[in-house]
């Protein structure tokens, strides 16, 4: 394929980063006590992520002003450049100069333990955001791209990735209404501002608990809320009456949890001793090495490079290509740290004008317990699976080798972005993979195979109901974001959609859609979860289920899917990986097959 050949040629022209003596085995980096490594704040120190300006909060202003000056230069340059591939390269460099400040600041504003850094990062985000709004309504800039895309001969001469990136930049312009007349353009800008304000208010409201008078609670449960004052806070409740046999929408999580515990004996404390963080990281490195020729190494960060003493820096190294990028692991709990597990792009990869490749840099944020003097950090099965999930995102970023940072790594369509991370969950639940690293931290005993089997089978309890719930959510999201004005209230639509797509009844006088935060972050895209899971399941079944360490399949996975980031149509990547064109029925059937209690994915022999 043209993209694959061009990628191969690109890789051959890159400078190989050789092995560094600063690298150490990844497991060792996570077995050292975090408390034993204090940030040295004495003397001269570098900046966050190695950015010299960010040795102090004031550096954000310096960095943003530097980026804004470069942006102005690039705008003048692209407007004076004849239409052609160079137009797209300059647009991407312009985007990169802003993203390298905005993406970094977007992370620091929520994760840095020092208020001054968070506030400075917040201001940088606002400043860069204002510039982006101006650029998206800059008519001269828009016309420089329009001249390229309006010339059919020029467009036909572009390679597929360059054409796709040009079209994505044009889409950003049109979302801002720049192609409209002045009156409509102003209306579009005003609507976008209103959408942002309403979205922010909605998200804040989804997290506020309800306060009600105690006298409104049923007498049989009132004694559970003996609190001072006349009000109680209601977060989530379940039925307390054993003989109440009517199943309500809030009951399935409770009862499915009971069934898992009673039928499969999967008490987390039985598993945690086998999942020390160091062992899990070694397992990931081993898996990546066997599948992709990639290893993870710990690297000592420079003074001032990290924001907390327990952050680890990993170098991602290919056996023949050398250094691919860096992953900063912010894994441990601390005061004021957001309670969310996520992946942040700090710097996207791209091919620079000098022929070198700008290495990607990402952060993985988890909330794991700290180790102690006598006890390493031990993960529950859920934590272990989540670690694998987030590392799937990280490797997507590391192995993307796009020419343009605008489509690097995870900067791809939402319904494809979760495929690499969900695929990693299948590896995390395969005994042949788990057996390679799950050892009791004291005795060295391997995790028994039957324990892995029980754990995997337990996840299928009520899985069909869970999937039906996801279908209901996705359908509701599509209707809410369909043709407007809506034919009835959002609550009436909720009731009708629930009765059509879900097996449990709507509860009168409730409006839980007002707390469904995904309507903002995944508006009109909630189906992406099911779509990504279907694709990941098909890739697992057809490429890795027989042998999870299949190097040929791993190389194809990198070449056909990971390497392209968002620079190629997702379905073309899926077709390249599966070597066929899957149908909707194929996707549905693979999701249904995952529910089969006789499904042997996790029980296959290692031979």
Regions found by a protein language model. Give the residues of each.
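Active-site-proximal, well-structured secondary-structure segments within enzyme catalytic domains
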Residues: 161, 165-167, 182, 186-189, ...
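Zinc-dependent metallopeptidase catalytic helix centered on the HExxH motif
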Residues: 386, 390, 394-427
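Active-site recognition of the HExxH zinc-binding catalytic motif
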Residues: 288, 370, 375-398, 421, ...
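C-terminal substrate/ligand-recognition segments
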Residues: 388, 464-483, 509, 516-541, ...
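N-terminal chloroplast transit peptides
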Residues: 1-16
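N-terminal helix-rich structural modules
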Residues: 2-4, 19-225
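C-terminal amphipathic alpha-helical interaction region
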Residues: 548-607
């Amino acid at each position: 394929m043209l993209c694959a050949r061009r990628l191969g040629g690109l890789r051959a022209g890159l400078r190989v980063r050789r092995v560094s003596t600063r690298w150490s085995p990844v497991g060792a980096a996570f077995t050292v006590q975090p408390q034993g490594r204090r940030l040295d704040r004495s003397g001269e120190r570098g900046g966050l992520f190695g950015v010299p300006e960010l040795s102090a909060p004031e550096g954000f202003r310096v960095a943003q002003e530097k980026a804004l000056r470069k942006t102005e230069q690039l705008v003048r340059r692209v407007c004076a450049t004849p239409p052609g591939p160079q137009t797209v390269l300059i647009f991407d460099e312009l985007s990169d100069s802003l993203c390298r400040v905005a993406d970094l600041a977007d992370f620091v504003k929520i994760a840095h333990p020092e208020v001054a850094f968070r506030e400075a990062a917040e201001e940088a985000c606002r400043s860069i955001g204002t510039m982006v709004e101006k650029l998206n309504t800059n008519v001269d800039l828009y016309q420089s791209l329009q001249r390229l895309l309006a010339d059919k001969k020029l467009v036909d001469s572009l390679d597929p990735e360059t054409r796709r990136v040009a079209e994505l930049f044009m889409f950003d312009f049109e979302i801002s209404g720049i192609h409209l007349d002045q009156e409509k353009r102003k209306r579009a800008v005003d609507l976008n501002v209103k959408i942002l304000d309403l979205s922010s208010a909605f998200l804040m409201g989804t997290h506020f608990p309800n306060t009600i008078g105690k006298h409104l609670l049923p007498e049989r449960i009132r004694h559970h809320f003996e609190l001072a004052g006349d009000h109680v806070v209601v977060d989530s409740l379940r039925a307390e009456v054993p003989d109440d046999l009517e199943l309500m929408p809030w009951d399935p999580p409770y009862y499915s949890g009971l069934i898992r515990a009673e039928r499969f004996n999967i008490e987390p404390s039985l598993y945690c001793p086998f999942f020390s963080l160091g062992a899990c990281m070694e397992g990931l490195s081993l898996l990546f090495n066997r599948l992709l020729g990639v290893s993870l190494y710990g690297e000592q960060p420079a003074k001032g490079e990290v924001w907390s003493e327990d952050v680890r820096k990993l170098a991602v190294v290919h056996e023949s290509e050398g250094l691919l990028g860096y992953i900063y692991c912010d894994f441990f709990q601390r005061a004021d740290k957001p309670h969310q597990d996520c992946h942040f792009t700090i710097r996207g990869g791209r091919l620079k004008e000098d022929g070198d490749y700008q290495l990607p840099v990402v952060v993985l944020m988890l909330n794991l317990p700290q180790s102690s003097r006598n006890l390493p950090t031990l993960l529950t099965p859920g934590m272990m699976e989540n670690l694998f999930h987030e590392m799937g995102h990280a490797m997507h970023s590391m192995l993307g080798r796009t020419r343009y940072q605008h489509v690097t790594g995870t900067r791809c369509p939402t319904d494809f972005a979760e495929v690499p991370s969900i695929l990693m969950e299948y590896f995390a639940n395969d005994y042949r993979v788990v057996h390679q690293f799950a050892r009791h931290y004291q005795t060295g005993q391997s995790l028994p195979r039957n324990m892995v089997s029980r754990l995997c089978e337990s996840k299928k309890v009520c899985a069909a109901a869970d999937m039906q719930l996801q279908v209901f959510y996705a359908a509701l999201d599509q209707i809410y974001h369909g043709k407007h004005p809506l034919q009835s209230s959002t609550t009436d639509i909720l009731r009708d959609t629930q009765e059509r797509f879900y097996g449990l009844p709507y509860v009168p006088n409730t409006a839980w859609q007002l707390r469904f935060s995904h309507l903002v972050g995944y508006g009109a895209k909630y189906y992406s979860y099911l779509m990504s899971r279907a694709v990941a399941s098909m890739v697992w079944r057809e490429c890795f289920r027989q042998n999870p360490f299949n190097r040929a399949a791993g190389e194809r996975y990198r070449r056909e899917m990971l390497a392209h980031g968002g620079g190629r149509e997702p379905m073309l990547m899926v077709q390249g990986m599966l070597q066929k064109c899957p149908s909707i029925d194929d996707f549905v059937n693979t999701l249904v097959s995952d529910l089969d209690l006789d499904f042997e994915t996790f029980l296959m022999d290692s031979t």
